[in-house]
Amino acid sequence: MINSPRVCVQVQSMYIETQSQPESDRYVFAYTITLRNLGRHPVQLIGRYWLITNANGQETEVQGEGVVGEKPRILPGGEFQYTSGAVLETPLGTMQGHYDMVDDQGQGFHVAIPVFRLAIPSLIN
């Protein structure tokens, strides 16, 4: 049995008011992801899958290679952080998904991205 390498995912999201246009149903959010390699071997992020859901239940799937134009290799005890964005038609939504990773032996595995909320500050009490 192959033990999957341990990778921790931490997410922070924020509303970008200066780029949003609520009167046109355009709400812009940024999210910062930190990936930490808690295992004993290097791992590499090679792809991503996102499920983005707005407050009306409309779902959008996004998948592709790497993140922000990179396929980072993360050493044991190391981390990789990046910031990206999402545009919703509602002031509230969620994102979730997974990263496609490989270890040094070429063994592929998924790392889950937990559900996180995208919300304008006035909706968070």
Curated annotation (Swiss-Prot):
Disulphide connectivity of cysteines: none
A Gene Ontology BP annotation from the UniProt entry: error-free translesion synthesis
Name of this chain's protein: Protein ApaG
A Pfam family of this chain: DUF525
NCBIfam families, per database record: PRK05461.1
PROSITE patterns cross-referenced by the UniProt entry: APAG
Signal peptide residue numbers: none
PANTHER family in the record: F-BOX ONLY PROTEIN 3, POLYMERASE DELTA-INTERACTING PROTEIN 2
Species, as recorded: Sodalis glossinidius (strain morsitans)
Domain ApaG: 1-125
Source organism, top-level taxon: Bacteria
